[in-house]
């Protein structure tokens, strides 16, 4: 039987262990530093309320990923999910994504309309008659200059104009990433078509599946199912790595494996020889309120786009459907005390690639931390694990 080491027991690590279990013929060891599996997706409790470390609803455009997880953790669809953003200078909550009906109520409605029109006109003028002829009326109306952007700030301004960018994005993004300038963000993994103003229904997810586990303990059963055949070692640190030889030291014992699947930051595997990879963390403050619900119907969480220290308030009963006369909300405050989000900066991604290039055949690095990509969610970690399985099969 071949041997596999999975470094990290978060969702990515558990998903990887499960794919090896389904494949068969693998003796799998999962090593996790925390005293439990699941990382921030693990259900915790405060005042009797179940919650996770930040909202962890399941989002995916892939039906087969949804059906896979739904098989082991039955899911409830949350297509009614709406976002709000608080804009303090306006003393108003607005829908997010930005909605056309809200723009009409904004103090700068005329200015915003002129900016959007100018962007659209400029974008149309850049196209040839042949290109224009291929576009629908809706596509023409949504044309912008985002494809010309060189950084995050330009991307938004070229999409929606300076006024909306200032209301919804500028301070929020700098706060979220703890940066002084959004121009430092130059990872263009978002759509080159830019951001468009939403019309029609206000539900946030009309092109993706949005869901959450039905069970009171959330995703926890998946972590047990996925690792039931594995040798799971929690509260355990890997003391030393020799990745070129697929060898590690655990509790003073040297162990070599046929494959290694890494789900932690890749710099840790090589003693940060190319420099440390930066992350942004979160401080999470749980608060129980003496009301049954705090947020409006269908609103699961609220963004705060201004000078507030916190970025988001989440009401977990909207996800969990927990029954109680009280409700639990959390405040998320960006922090450097933990490492949750890889920075979307190309120079840091290039640094991460240096570590990936040092990994030999038989060593895989997956998940948000393992791939050093911010825009990796639960569905992506499952997909990464399936891709590793497919490579091993071939």
List each model region and its residues.
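Structural/interface elements that position substrates and couple domains in central-metabolism enzymes
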Residues: 67-71, 155, 164, 297-298, ...
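C-terminal catalytic lobe of FAD-dependent flavoproteins
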Residues: 342-394
């Amino acid at each position: 039987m071949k041997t596999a080491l999975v470094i990290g027991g978060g969702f990515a690590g558990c998903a990887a262990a499960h794919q090896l279990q389904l494949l068969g013929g693998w003796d799998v060891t999962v090593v996790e530093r925390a005293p439990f599996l699941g990382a921030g997706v693990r259900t915790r409790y405060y005042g009797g309320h179940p919650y996770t470390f930040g909202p962890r609803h399941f989002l995916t455009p892939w039906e087969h990923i949804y059906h896979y997880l739904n098989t082991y953790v039955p899911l409830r669809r949350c297509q009614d999910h709406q976002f709000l953003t608080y804009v303090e200078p306006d003393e108003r909550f607005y829908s997010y994504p930005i909605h056309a009906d809200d723009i009409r109520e904004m103090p700068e409605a005329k200015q915003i309309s002129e900016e959007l029109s100018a962007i659209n006109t400029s974008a149309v003028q850049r196209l040839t008659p042949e290109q224009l002829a291929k576009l629908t009326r809706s596509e023409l109306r949504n044309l912008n200059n985002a494809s010309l952007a060189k950084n995050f700030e330009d991307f938004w301004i070229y999409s929606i104009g300076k006024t909306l960018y200032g209301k919804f994005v500028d301070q929020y993004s700098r706060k979220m990433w703890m940066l002084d300038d959004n121009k430092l963000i130059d990872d263009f993994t978002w759509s080159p078509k830019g951001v468009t103003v939403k019309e029609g229904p206000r539900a946030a997810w009309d092109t993706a599946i949005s869901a959450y586990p039905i069970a009171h303990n959330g995703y926890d059963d998946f972590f047990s199912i996925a690792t039931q055949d594995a040798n799971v070692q929690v509260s355990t640190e890997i003391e030393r790595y020799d990745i070129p030889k697929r060898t590690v030291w655990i509790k003073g014992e040297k162990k070599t494996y046929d494959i290694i699947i890494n789900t932690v930051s890749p710099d840790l595997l090589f003693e940060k020889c190319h420099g440390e990879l930066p992350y942004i963390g979160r401080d999470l403050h749980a608060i129980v309120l003496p009301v049954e619900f705090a947020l409006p119907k269908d609103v699961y969480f609220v963004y705060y786009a201004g000078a507030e220290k916190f970025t988001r308030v989440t009401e977990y009963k909207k996800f969990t459907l927990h029954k109680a006369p009280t409700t639990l909300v959390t405040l998320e405050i960006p922090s450097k005390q933990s490492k949750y989000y890889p920075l979307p900066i190309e120079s840091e991604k290039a640094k991460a690639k240096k570590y990936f290039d040092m990994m030999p055949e038989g060593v895989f690095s997956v998940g948000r931390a393992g791939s050093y990509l911010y825009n990796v969610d639960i569905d992506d970690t499952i997909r990464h694990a399936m891709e590793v399985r497919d490579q091993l099969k071939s």
